[in-house]
Swiss-Prot record:
Similarity comment: family membership: Belongs to the oligoribonuclease family.
The protein's name in its UniProt record: Oligoribonuclease
GO molecular function, one term: nucleic acid binding
Keyword Nuclease: yes
Gene: orn
Key words of the record: Cytoplasm, Exonuclease, Hydrolase, Nuclease
Length: 219
């Protein structure tokens, strides 16, 4: 029996509900000195089903650009094998950006730009905005940051936080994306209201309770 038949996973959601998951590896965190050296992207529907093969590209960097890495980043990229692949790669950043844009065009509705999704993605978005502006324009200004859910789980449901799936810490872009999708899937199962969700009446009651609680701040 398929997942859709036993109702554990809803059917693939509409094109205007997609999420674009992007993870970057850089030579550091300074937008002016450091460059993107690995780009990975996957598209999921609203139910976190991965659509298609995605993008997984190592971007060439010059020796001068690699020399900007500090000791921590140097050791991280060397131990993962990324540094050698950067030197061997002939892929330009524009080509990597083109590949992600093609992925978005294939799976997403251009009339409804998809949010960027990932883990602690503010830095990734900053590098996208600075070094891949066409990709930035193709994404919705809103973002889905799994680390925000993580922080709420830590405060509200510590057991959920401490039982989250362990990460491999590969420090490679595609592996990081898959781990982020898996983590959000875990939170959806353990943290959020089970399907089919609350009734309209329950939502109305909860909304009124929230309004009542914070009403004094609006007096």
């Amino acid at each position: 029996m398929s997942e859709s038949e036993n109702n554990t996973t809803p059917a693939v959601a509409a094109r205007d509900d997609r999420l674009v998951w992007v993870d970057l590896e850089m030579t550091g965190l300074d937008l002016k000195r450091h460059v993107i050296v690995e780009v990975a992207a996957l598209v999921t529907d609203a139910n976190l089903n991965v659509l298609g093969e995605g993008v997984d590209l190592v971007v060439h960097a010059t020796e001068e650009e690699l020399a900007q890495m500090d000791d921590f980043v140097t050791n991280m990229h060397e131990s993962s094998g990324l540094t050698e692949q950067i030197r061997e790669s002939a892929v330009t950043l524009k080509e990597a950006e083109d590949a992600v844009l093609a992925l978005i065009e294939k799976h997403c509705d251009p009339a409804h730009p998809a949010p960027l999704a990932g883990n602690s993605i503010a830095t990734d978005r900053a590098f996208i905005r600075e070094q891949m502006p066409r990709l930035d324009e193709a994404l919705h200004y809103r973002m889905v940051d799994v680390s925000s859910v993580k922080e709420l789980a830590r405060r509200w449901y510590p057991r959920v936080y401490y039982k989250q799936p362990e990460k491999g810490l590969a420090h490679r872009a595609l592996a990081d994306i898959v781990e982020s999708i898996r983590e959000l899937d875990y939170y959806r199962r353990s943290f959020f209201v089970a399907e089919p969700g609350p009734t309209s009446e329950q939502c109305a009651d909860d909304a009124q309770a929230a309004v009542d609680r914070f009403a004094p701040y609006f007096d």
